[in-house]
A protein has these predicted regions:
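Extreme N-terminal starter segment of soluble prokaryotic enzymes
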Residues: 1-3
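Local cysteine-cluster metal-coordination motifs and their immediate loop/turn environment
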Residues: 8-19
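C-terminal scaffold of the Radical SAM
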Residues: 18-44, 54-313
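Short amphipathic alpha-helical interaction segments
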Residues: 315-328
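A short, conserved structural fragment
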Residues: 326-336
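Minor-groove-contacting beta-hairpin "wing" of winged helix-turn-helix DNA-binding domains
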Residues: 337-341
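Short, amphipathic alpha-helical interaction segments positioned at domain boundaries
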Residues: 342-355
């Protein structure tokens, strides 16, 4: 079993962000009280036993804008249920992840930290609505290493309207300088979501395939191993196990405002309104996924990652199309699974196989 916890609070709302996030306010104490109730209920409902939780991911929002002591009771609840080799990830922003916060979170059990850097360039940071700077990024990474984190991720965003070869070379130069301080990189192609500050501003996205190819190629030349369209690690042992579980279609519980869980072909949605969540944190609306939904999800997630496609989950006409892709060398076959050697065309392949 895998577990996700959502912390919705942020110092400010980034222009591209479509996740549920709120400015820190008087609801923080009430939220954590509701969150604990939610977690306890979910653990009982799904009968989670000792050593069953393989990964725990605390995301947001910005978990680092909340004092570490707020997480103590949550960890006390979860400790007996964590696998001895559990991966515990927590998102953080460079400006709010202080040395003390990092130290306290590590003492609680967090062993993987993920920094929402997004860019090293001041103009691009401003464009994205980020409130940190390059000095803060370096300081946060140094502090994470100082307190003993062995698994450190850094996020970058590319394909914005500001991106050209010169801008991407700037990002790569600074990434190279701090490469020794990280073990993992998430590089996301900017997506314009409907409920963001960038909505109705499609021109804010570059849509430049050649620049995307250039950027990915340069990341690989920095000796990062690409295991998903947006994720790179220095070694296979430093892959994010939690995200891998998503792509493998594993069961995961999710608690917190606007959280989405998955269990036995069903999706579980918590309340999207803060007051509603605080009043009734155990509420879930349930979506039963059809075999068609599951097949489509398996195709999209498998083709964009090293997970691949399980041949037993394909129907005959999909297998016929797969054979065409094999002949064209757009896929390869190994151990009863089909793999995509070029993640950049994953959506195109998935649509072809599902149509």
């Amino acid at each position: 079993m895998h577990f996700y916890i959502h912390i919705p609070f942020c110092e400010s709302k980034c222009n591209y962000c479509a996740f549920t996030s709120l400015k820190k306010n008087d609801y923080e104490k009430a939220y954590f009280k509701a969150l604990k109730k939610d977690i306890i209920f979910q653990l009982k409902q799904f009968n989670i036993q000792s050593n069953q939780i393989k990964t725990l991911f605390i995301g947001g929002g910005t978990p680092s804008c909340v004092d570490a002591y707020n997480y103590e009771d949550i960890f006390k609840i979860l400790y007996p249920l964590l696998d001895k080799n559990v991966e515990i990830s927590c998102e953080a922003n460079p400006n709010s992840a202080t040395l003390n916060w990092l130290k306290n979170m590590k003492n609680l059990g967090v062993n993987r930290i993920s920094f929402g850097t997004q860019s090293f360039h001041p103009k691009k940071l401003h464009f994205l609505g980020r409130i940190h700077n390059q000095k803060m990024i370096i300081k946060a990474l140094e502090n994470a290493n100082k307190v003993g984190f062995k698994n450190i991720n850094l996020d970058l965003i590319y394909d914005t309207k500001l991106d050209n070869k010169k801008m991407l070379e700037f990002e790569l130069l600074h990434l190279k300088k701090i490469k020794a301080l990280i073990t993992h990189l998430s590089a996301y192609n900017l997506t314009i979501e409907s409920n963001t500050a960038f909505a109705k501003k499609e021109h804010f996205k570059k849509n430049a395939p050649n620049l995307i190819k250039f950027f990915i190629k340069q990341l690989l030349e920095l000796d990062f191993f690409q295991y998903e369209i947006s994720n790179f690690s220095k070694t296979k042992s430093q892959i994010c196990k939690h995200n891998l579980a998503y792509w493998q279609g594993k069961n995961y519980l999710a608690c917190g405002l606007s959280a989405v869980g998955f269990y036995e072909n069903k999706r579980f949605y918590t309340a999207k309104n803060l007051k509603n969540y605080i009043e009734n944190p155990t509420f879930r609306s349930i979506e039963q996924l059809s075999s068609k939904d599951l097949n489509l999800e398996h195709l999209f997630l498998g083709l964009r990652s090293i997970v691949g496609i399980d041949e037993t989950k394909l129907n005959q006409w999909q297998k016929d199309k797969i054979n065409i892709l094999l002949k064209e060398k757009k896929l390869f076959y190994k151990n009863k699974r089909y793999f995509n050697p070029n993640f950049l065309i994953s959506d195109e392949l998935a649509l072809y196989l599902s149509s």
